[in-house]
């Protein structure tokens, strides 16, 4: 981990400051090290260590993508940061090749992400939650990033890769905590509720996504006898579109095609491809869940209760269990469900104009008035992920988004690993272009 000595941190002018060191930031750091070793970059990460989906590392769950769509392979198959090299270095390559599974286990991939991050520890400071961004001009235009601990960091270019914000429906927002949580917090919230109750739990899972089905299966598989209330607006879990033709949406050529399409064409393409990534479930998970429900019926039990075509109309979190008011969407029939824990498998917010979207990442609020917006009020983003300044705003240092651009770049920016390494190269080329390739390691400052 980078040593943060306070004064040096505030005086150093880096070439690049990255906010967020998740998979997107790690992939970019790997590309910078291998392809631009003279460029001085520093990433700020709010967590105390690198992590990938820590709240959803469920036993038996997989990544749903090819193992070589990793942090480096598509950019450089000879990179030491590939998943295969991780397996080689950790002595598990042959064992992995013998596993009868299409995709890597999520727990294995999380270890891979941490392993790569450890190799790049000189490029990151952990425990630094970025809270503010401002623009300064002395000695050259640059960004100043403030953090919750009071330290500030400066960079001639800024890359924002904070990940998407969990989407929490309005009725649930006042109740978030130990008994109502987003799926991204599932594992540790469940552990706390188990400890508090000391017996089987009633858990309501809201949504019909891959995460919703995996959580239902995980609860049923545990030896605690939990009961699951699966609450969904549709008739049931739907099968994910895994056609190789649809999977070509994760090709860089499709990213070019999508980016250059009209707004109407993008909307049409997004609707066509939605079942390949949203509100749908892999076949193996669906089949396992259905067999579990059938087997419960054979034994005279009902531990997975489906509340089909239902929406939540009210939430109460007084003494005792959480009370959810439900309404059947077609008949209007009302009923109530009580739960010791409510898990919201309701997805994440994108950058876009829709009701559930955000116009820009929250961290950019202080500088948003100087950034170009489209006619819907959403950040303009160019093909290399550069966010141009607003006309008349004057000179601005370059700003890039890393992994937040599904609205403009398609499914490759939808939180998947599939194009991470190629996006890192595109970002690197954009940074070089915007800074000027002849300018590197500004001020010659030592890393803090």
Region roles according to the model:
Residues 1-48, 96-448:
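Flavin (primarily FAD) cofactor-binding/catalytic cores of flavoenzymes
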Residues 2-6, 24, 33, 55-57, ...:
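Generic N-terminal leader segments that precede the first folded domain
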Residues 38, 59-73, 182-183, 328:
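Short, solvent-exposed coil/turn linker segments
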Residues 49-51, 74:
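Charge- and polar-rich, low-complexity intrinsically disordered segments of small proteins and propeptides
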Residues 52-66, 247, 281:
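Glycine-rich phosphate-binding loop and adjoining beta1-alpha1-beta2 segment
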Residues 62-95, 254-266:
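Flavin (FAD/FMN) cofactor-binding and adjacent substrate-gating region
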